[in-house]
Amino acid sequence: MKQSKMLIPTLREMPSDAQVISHALLMRAGYVRQVSAGIYAYLPLANRVLEKLKNIMREEFDEIGAVELLAPSLLTADLWRESGRYDTYGEDLYKLKNRDNSDFILGPTHEETMTSLVRDEITSYKKLPLNVYQIAPKFRDEKRPRYGLLRGREFLMKDGYSYHADQDSLDETYNDYKKAYEKIFERAGLNFKPIIADAGAMGGKDSQEFIAITDDRINLEKWLVLSKNITSIEEIPESVLSEIKEELGKWLIAGEDTIVYAEGGDYAANIEMASSQFEPNVAYTEELELEKVATPGAKTIDEVSKFLEIDEEQTVKTLVYHADDELVVVLLNGNDQLNEVKLTNYLGASFIEAASEAEVEEKFGAHFGSLGPIGLENVKIIADRKVEQIKNAVVGANVDGFHYKNANFGRDYEVEEFVDLRTVNEGEISPDGRGTLKFARGIEIGHIFKLGTRYTEAMNANILDANGRSIPMLMGCYGIGVSRLLSAILEQFARIYVEKTPREEFKFSWSINFPKELAPFDIHLVPVNVKDEAAMELTSELEEKLRGKGYQVLVDDRNERAGVKFADSDLIGLPVRVTIGKKAAEGVVEVKIRATGEVVEINKDELVNTIEILSK
């Protein structure tokens, strides 16, 4: 492929509006262009990478018996009314009307559409399981699209759906998808973790996310590729390393997910679902007499603890939430934070919201800083399981400026149930006891769900089972953010190339270091002077030879300065660059391996073998 025939509009500088390195490099290297806020055009290079990702997915899904189809993006609202999501999905849903004033949506996901297709065609358990998927655009009206392809209004997604007559069949397909996802992300070269996740608005029971880790900003060696005349990172002057660290610090760590994993163990979960080992305290502590004390001006846990000269561990804080139409009081250890997802899941609520200060004062006669569980009536009280173990606790007295000392569950107040409601902290023990918990940031690149009958029951997607009974099909759904994957790959494979000039000066620049299986082309042939007849003849000869060996080759046939060509080649990030320069008449070329920075000068007859050896 001739570079002059392709649309690769590289930029000399990073775009000023980019906040994460993946967005900046995709724009600067000419992979994408923004058409509107949150909407991007995938230019030829990006499209080639996406096609390679799609083909990897197709190969792995073929292995598990998943069949590809293509559903429309413009969907009737009637199906979403059947499932109940038309009015509950929220403002992210694109709603529109046709000329007949009928309601339609642009699909953010396709559970309803697929279920309607299946219910019209399958009526017996004998035709199940069915496992289908598509790779197609999705739409969400993001209030604040940002971070390039990571949070857009239109995005490319692989969404799969499976239908089953029994739980064993659903479990088997769910596990097949988990293994297929792991193979896909491994082939993409990603550092990722499968984690326990919340099903959220999708509904259903079991759920697992796949997160690409993005928060490594400390390990400089991971980011740097050194030129052949730099032997180690220690050779780089401290002033240059400081500049590199400053450059790294300009870019936000991509990914809005915090994951929790066990260092030295297998446990991993989203922060919303993570728990730690809970060991009941069996030691006996004498219950002291309840005492009401003045705490003037002390409204926070920190202020109360300091005023009473106690540890925060000895306090219980009281929170108030609306859960659908019910008011709920939640008790936590004073130095813990409430995990709202755990609270939502425990209550089975579709909506929770913290009560306002005014509501609390009207209902309980005190502000939050003095609120406590003693004397509360006609309200549900639930507590984190740690609260049960706090003997002689300090709690609010439901009178502003006062607290109780020595409050004890069972004697002074009651709790409907003790459950895990807190957000875990780093350094705690994994729930399985194997390893301590660590936090990391990452990008969600895949998500699988066991939806059960969440959609099939609502939409009357029933079959006759082996006994002739009409039952709703069981359902699973399985998503991969394909365009997100492109950003995740760049977040992990962006590199800073450091070179030492003949004048012993150190320079550095950003480069993309695509994994071999995903690079838009395998090899970049760069003739330095397109007016040099010998160089162009050798370029054509090498292109033909390399293509004959199965390599995908991009030839920079532009009449540009050598510096421009090399800068663009570094930005584009193909695994191998072959430079045809002044020694073309002698049949000598220069080979540069992107991943290692290694550069060798070889005879043209050694090119294929050299590339195979150096690329391993």
Curated annotation (Swiss-Prot):
Pfam families xref list: HGTP_anticodon, tRNA-synt_2b, tRNA_edit
Chief localisation class: cytoplasm
Keyword terms of this UniProt record: Aminoacyl-tRNA synthetase, ATP-binding, Cytoplasm, Ligase, Nucleotide-binding, Protein biosynthesis
Residues of the signal peptide: none
Its EC number(s): 6.1.1.15
Entry-linked InterPro entries: aa-tRNA-synt_IIb, aa-tRNA-synth_II, aa-tRNA-synth_II/BPL/LPL, Anticodon-bd, Anticodon-bd_dom_sf, Pro-tRNA-ligase_IIa, Pro-tRNA-synth_IIa_bac-type, Pro-tRNA-Synthase_IIa_type1
GO biological process, one term: prolyl-tRNA aminoacylation
Subcellular location: Cytoplasm
Origin: domain of life: Bacteria
GO molecular function annotations of the record: aminoacyl-tRNA deacylase activity; ATP binding; catalytic activity, acting on a protein; proline-tRNA ligase activity; transferase activity
Catalytic activity from the UniProt record: tRNA(Pro) + L-proline + ATP = L-prolyl-tRNA(Pro) + AMP + diphosphate
Quaternary assembly: Homodimer.
Family stated for the protein in its record: Belongs to the class-II aminoacyl-tRNA synthetase family. ProS type 1 subfamily.
Function recorded in the entry: Catalyzes the attachment of proline to tRNA(Pro) in a two-step reaction: proline is first activated by ATP to form Pro-AMP and then transferred to the acceptor end of tRNA(Pro). As ProRS can inadvertently accommodate and process non-cognate amino acids such as alanine and cysteine, to avoid such errors it has two additional distinct editing activities against alanine. One activity is designated as 'pretransfer' editing and involves the tRNA(Pro)-independent hydrolysis of activated Ala-AMP.
Domain notes: Consists of three domains: the N-terminal catalytic domain, the editing domain and the C-terminal anticodon-binding domain.
Name used for this protein in its record: Proline--tRNA ligase
Organism: Lactococcus lactis subsp. lactis (strain IL1403)
Gene from which the chain derives: proS
